[in-house]
Amino acid sequence: MTEREFVSVFRSSKKGDTYLFVRRGQKWDDLPEALRGIFGSPIHSMDLLLTPDKKLARTTGKEVLAAIEEKDFFLQMPEEQDTYIVDFKRKIEQHRK
């Protein structure tokens, strides 16, 4: 695994709270077509020097670097919400109306 790597982070134009980590300078057209289609137009969020010990919001630098080394990208999806909680909130809102 790489000791450190400059990476670019993009957010999805189609899916909220979805981020793509790639090597800085990675060509969008070189990524899998299925990924590009689902992700939509990439919106640049930031560039950073990533090391294995770096802690990120939902993952670690080690996981991101390993994925980039293996498949040229790391896709961070939104955390799954417990549908019970979502349904409960919806019922509360409906009750208030």
Swiss-Prot record:
Origin superkingdom: Bacteria
Transmembrane feature ranges: none
One Pfam short name: YcgL
Domain called YcgL: residue spans: 5-89
Cystines in this chain: none
Protein name: YcgL domain-containing protein Maqu_1609
Species, as recorded: Marinobacter nauticus (strain ATCC 700491 / DSM 11845 / VT8) (Marinobacter aquaeolei)
